[in-house]
Amino acid sequence: MPREDRATWKSNYFLKIIQLLNDYPKCFIVGADNVGSKQMQTIRLSLRGKAIVLMGKNTMMRKAIRGHLENNPALEKLLPHIRGNVGFVFTKEDLPEVRDMLLANKVPAAARAGAIAPCEVTVPAQNTGLGPEKTSFFQALGITTKISRGTIEILSDVQLIRPGDKVGASEATLLNMLNISPFSYGLIIQQVYDNGSVYSPEVLDITEDALHKRFLEGVRNIASVCLQIGYPTLASIPHSIINGYKRVLRVAVETDYSFPMADKVKAFLADPSRFAVAAAPSVAAAPAAVRLVPLLSRPRRSPRSLMRTWLRPVRLK
């Protein structure tokens, strides 16, 4: 009878994980080291309506996924990441939002002897409130102290544990005596699965503004290269047209060739003061004119020299 119950439980588990993989296009592979049952229950409650947490043996999860590859071959990308104490968090919501909910459910924890430190632990300079009889304990750890008003005072910040170090018994005892809980434990996102793609959780930190900025930088670089080599692209053509138009204006200024815009430029060169006065009340309506005002106001340069500066072709950096 117990064997049948076990077999039934396995069958139901396989059906459940396959159902979740079919229903949810996105999930996290999360590490659950040092997460207790009470904390796991709290996490499940906080994610209710937003996500579903599924834990289990790695062999069972791999077997269920392999049996479902015919229907969804993209799931094979998950198999290399199912190792260690891991589980799944399935969701249809915004991934950064669910990630933030998982981070909010981390709980502080005391250092235990033999544990691997996930982060650096620094003991700040402070009056410990401990009696002088503990001085030898601090000396054994290489911590400089003095006796102040009958208690031990740590004189400077001390890096006690580095990331990846194994916590020793002395370090754990000291942190407990000082009521310092240096670590925090919770479900740690190791990989993200999103509609057939698997990527690291750092990608979730990339915002739309950052993508927009990178895209504009790329467009600017392409336009700059294409302008230099004379190869037309969508990014460089507007600048090429502007540069060509400026060259035509420069030719018209130097010769008798005339067209409406060239006539205006020649009129400005003939009487720069008239242009400066006319441009003042119509700044918003004449952006090109605004560009000429500071140039015309500089001393020791002729109007023709100023116009040549303005007509110089644009070169992107």
From Swiss-Prot:
A Pfam family assignment: Ribosomal_L10
InterPro entries (alphabetical): Ribosomal_protein_uL10, Ribosomal_uL10, Ribosomal_uL10-like_insert, Ribosomal_uL10-like_insert_sf, Ribosomal_uL10-like_sf, uL10_eukaryotes
Gene3D superfamilies xref list: 3.30.70.1730, 3.90.105.20
Keywords, ordered alphabetically: Phosphoprotein, Ribonucleoprotein, Ribosomal protein
Post-translational modification note: Phosphorylated.
GO annotations of cellular component type: cytosolic large ribosomal subunit
Signal peptide: none
Record keyword Ribosomal protein present: yes
BP-aspect Gene Ontology terms: cytoplasmic translation; ribosomal large subunit assembly
MF annotations from Gene Ontology: large ribosomal subunit rRNA binding; structural constituent of ribosome
Domain of life: Eukaryota
CDD domains xref list: Ribosomal_P0_L10e (cd05795)
Functional summary from the UniProt entry: Ribosomal protein P0 is the functional equivalent of E.coli protein L10.
Family designation: Belongs to the universal ribosomal protein uL10 family.
Assembly and binders: P0 forms a pentameric complex by interaction with dimers of P1 and P2.
Name of this chain's protein: Large ribosomal subunit protein uL10
Organism: Ictalurus punctatus (Channel catfish)
